[in-house]
């Protein structure tokens, strides 16, 4: 009964885990890395043809995007996921294959001109279409017997339509262990979808830590923030360009924009158009309509019961063909453009950035996570010039981020999820976070909840029966990332300091109601320590 960590270890993208148990070999997630890699990922330690089946937490490409590659390498087993996840993967894996093929063709035109070897995409459309046939839809909350000694259950993670945490019960040689994969834990009070569910028992937990080092803060009024952005941009006769994940975030933005129009919150600009320039987003929106019973929250259901489509409104224009996409940039009227990809590394958004980044009157609004090394992250961090389609583009547009809007729980949301267990798990593995964040959040779980935590690197193997590391690995830094290694090491030490600060706050809370004399002495000791280091 072994667990091997493959991807999203000390990194955010590329989730993949390999389990050997009860005579079966299976994967949990098989994600594609997005943005430059920091560490090398080890391969699955057996031929893909020997993998019996897979489980998938949700449809985002950083969790599902390498299933076509697994197929190309021989994987033929079933992939179990919620019904909504299966439907979303149907369109998202096709889209991923299309983007890869398109990018390969573009790169190869340049390669041929320069006499360089051709670039081969990781997988083809045929691989994607074939692996889609292997998906098996599962209901939320239903325990499913996948094999002798292996049962699973999907519960709502509140991150994306169909997203799940997965409970796995494994029995081997009379020993039963329960392991939970958190998947991506959702933020609370998101539009359309339900909040994440909490789980109460597990022997082992594999937990994400995307925002394990930060708080979203007090929830802003996103609708009013959007109104303010639209008003000042439209007054400049500029466009509002929103790089948005086609699945999930685009539908949330449509939900907000519908409210702005329905409540006449921009009376001076009542006729503004909203373009959704993404065939994938259009398809995803239709899937959102199909799975509302299982996934929608009460507020969205109330609108539907009143006959109101929560993500449709006058002035909404869906762009599917390339000609329709190109025509958007010839429309001189102020407008909102929602386009993918959300991190600006692929898709039609790159064309809209090329046409709007140089314009002082336009605004680029980021509404989602931007991984290290992506174009979106560079723009958020103040890049003055960027390169698009071989052309240097000066950044003159206003760059804005809707603070706190996220499909991911922040550090407090993660702590709430982790603290729901009635008994301490034997071990909590912290993954799916940037390098220092994994370390920081593992320390916080240890200090505040008393959990035995570990932040593994790719290739680490854990014996689930005996609760011991069978193989411990160190992160292998990819060559281009070595220059950042010293900075990461320094920030890792700082992460320990921050974790110690969190522990101190927890100790202070634990002493509430203590004797005044003891509390006064404790306060004096803290102040003395602060005086020493406040320099």
What label would you give each PLM region?
Residues 229-374, 386-387, 422, 437, ...:
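Hard-cation-handling environments
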Residues 387-418:
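Generic long, charged, amphipathic alpha-helical segments
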Residues 459-518:
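Charged, amphipathic alpha-helical linkers/stalks
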Residues 359, 434-479:
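C-terminal, active-site-flanking charged/polar segments
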Residues 150-154, 287-295, 415-416, 465-477:
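Short, surface-exposed amphipathic charged segments that create phosphate/polyanion-binding patches used
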Residues 191-206, 293-300, 370-396:
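Short, compositionally biased "basic patch" segments
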Residues 94-99, 103-106, 221-223, 256-261, ...:
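Short secondary-structure boundary/capping segments
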Residues 1-55, 64, 71-252, 256-273:
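His/Asp/Glu-rich metal-coordinating catalytic cores
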């Amino acid at each position: 009964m072994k667990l091997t960590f493959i991807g999203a270890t000390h990194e955010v993208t590329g989730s993949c885990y390999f389990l050997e148990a009860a005579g079966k070999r299976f994967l949990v997630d098989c994600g594609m890395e997005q943005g430059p890699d920091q560490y090398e990922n080890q391969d699955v330690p057996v031929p893909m043809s020997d993998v019996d089946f897979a489980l998938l937490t949700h449809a985002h490409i950083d969790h599902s995007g390498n299933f076509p590659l697994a197929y190309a390498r021989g994987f033929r087993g079933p992939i179990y996921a919620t019904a909504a996840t299966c439907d979303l993967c149907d369109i998202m894996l096709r889209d991923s294959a299309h983007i890869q093929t398109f990018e390969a063709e573009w790169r190869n035109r340049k390669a041929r001109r320069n006499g360089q070897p051709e670039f081969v995409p990781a997988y083809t459309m045929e691989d994607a279409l074939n692996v889609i046939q292997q998906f098996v839809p599962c209901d939320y909350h239903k325990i499913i017997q996948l094999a002798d000694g292996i049962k699973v259950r999907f519960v709502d993670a509140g991150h994306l339509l169909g997203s799940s945490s997965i409970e796995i019960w494994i029995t081997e040689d009379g020993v039963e262990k329960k392991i939970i994969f958190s998947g991506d834990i959702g933020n609370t009070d998101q539009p359309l979808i339900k909040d994440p569910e909490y789980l109460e028992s597990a022997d082992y937990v594999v937990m994400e830590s995307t925002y394990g080092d930060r708080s979203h803060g007090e929830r802003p009024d996103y609708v009013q923030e959007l109104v303010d952005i639209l008003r000042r941009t439209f007054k400049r006769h500029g466009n509002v360009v929103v790089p948005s994940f086609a699945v999930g975030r685009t539908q949330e933005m449509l939900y907000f924009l519908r409210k702005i129009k329905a409540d006449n919150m921009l009376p001076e600009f009542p006729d503004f158009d909203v373009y959704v320039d993404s065939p994938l987003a259009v398809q995803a929106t239709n899937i959102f309509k199909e799975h509302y019973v299982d996934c929608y929250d009460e507020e969205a259901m109330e609108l539907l019961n009143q006959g109101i489509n929560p993500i449709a409104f006058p002035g909404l224009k869906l762009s599917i063909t390339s000609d329709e996409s190109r025509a958007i940039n010839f429309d001189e009227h102020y407008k909102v453009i929602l386009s993918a990809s959300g991190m600006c590394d692929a898709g039609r958004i790159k064309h809209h950035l090329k046409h709007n980044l140089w314009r002082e009157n336009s605004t680029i609004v980021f509404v989602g996570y931007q991984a290290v090394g992506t174009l979106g992250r560079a723009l958020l961090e103040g890049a003055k010039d960027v390169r698009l389609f071989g052309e240097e583009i000066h950044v003159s547009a206003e760059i804005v981020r809707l603070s706190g809007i996220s499909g991911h729980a922040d550090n407090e949301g993660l702590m709430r999820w982790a603290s729901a267990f009635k008994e301490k798990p034997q071990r909590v593995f912290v993954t799916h976070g940037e390098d220092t964040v994994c370390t920081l959040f593992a320390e916080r779980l240890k200090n505040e909840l008393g959990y035995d935590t570990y932040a593994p690197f790719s290739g680490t193997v854990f014996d689930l029966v005996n609760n011991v590391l069978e193989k411990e690995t160190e992160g292998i830094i990819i060559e281009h990332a070595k220059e950042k290694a010293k900075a990461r090491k320094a920030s890792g030490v700082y992460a320990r300091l921050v974790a110690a600060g969190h522990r101190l706050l927890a100790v202070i809370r634990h002493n509430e109601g203590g004797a005044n004399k003891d509390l006064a002495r404790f306060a004096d000791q803290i102040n003395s320590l602060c005086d020493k280091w406040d320099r």
